[in-house]
Amino acid sequence: MNQLSDRLNSLSPSATLAMSQKSNELKAQGVDVINLSVGEPDFNTPDHIKEAAKKAVDDNFSRYSPVPGYPALRNAIVEKLKKENGLEYTAAQISCANGAKQSVCNTILVLVNPGDEVIVPAPYWVSYPEMVKMAEGTPVIVSAGIEQDFKITPEQLEAAITPKTKALILCSPSNPTGSVYTKEELAGLSAVLAKHPQVIVIADEIYEHINYIGAHQSIAQFPEMKERTVIVNGVSKAYAMTGWRIGFIAGPEWIVKACNKLQGQYTSGPCSVSQKAAEVAYTGTQEPVKEMQKAFQRRRDLIVKLAKDVPGFEVNVPQGAFYLFPKCDTFFGKSNGERKIADSDDLAMYLLEEAHVACVGGASFGAPECIRMSYATSDENIVEAIRRIKEALAKLK
């Protein structure tokens, strides 16, 4: 008899991956599906980065790497943080992993004991609460609705902190909402955290360069917060390198050493060839990053304009990332005569089957009244997707 662990059985499957799989299954059957469920850029990795990887292969750069990554990559990250963020770190305060996802999970696993609480603002990326549960901690969900641009307030943070609180996960720019915390908003959160020195901040900044409101702001830029903050970042989103799997943490050396110890026992260092590519991503020209950001902003403007014209959608303007997160609960309880919509997951499935547009219901993001749409696709796909969605929703009575 097969018996899986309680740890595994406590986890929920990824809704984003599940919807992407269903979309791909329909495509394989010949259905013309427009996929707005994916969380990755639709651009190709810039040529100069690919050339660096090719050279690494030709140079037989194919051995096991040090667990935290090669010094050359970690030093490139140190320079990036200094130049772009005004933050001083040493290479010993950097640990590279197989994507930012592993970097987040490593940090949670080395910090959280059974019974510890981790504050997770909602809407959240689907994996945050599951990672906390994997560490046998308790995710404490703090909800922020569309009326506050999906960003928690200092008062909400203060109310959520208890003696059991070990960490706060803060994602800005946000997946799934595209919300971005301003310097003033981060200052308000920092003032609360100053009263609770036991709380570590895990700052997921993977969408740093897909930001439409100016220079990126990190909570680690506040002097009193730097030694209590673990920055998580990587090359996936900014450089269109999702499959290369390079992420990193920058933070207090005691946490970085712990992550190295943990990672050394289950994956070791990340891919050597990918590290060479990531090194060149950070040290080479940044023009492709700027061009992709401009394209994403144009698409953001387009999808917001079109979605605001969809009856029943409540839309805010995302300030970063490449997601729209409209409120859609006006459709709950309605039917097209064949299917009744109970929640946003039902609505997402209805849109996939009726409009052949893949979106992701908001329940897995901690916001069951919303639905996530990725605009990491062509302008033409955005226009056609919203047309189909509008037509399908009009059938619900």
Region annotations inferred by a language model:
Residues 2-4, 8, 12-14, 19, ...:
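PLP-dependent class I/II
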Residues 24, 78, 82, 108-109:
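Generic structural signal for well-ordered alpha-helical scaffold segments
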Residues 64-97:
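Conserved N-terminal alpha-helix of the aminotransferase class I/II PLP-enzyme fold
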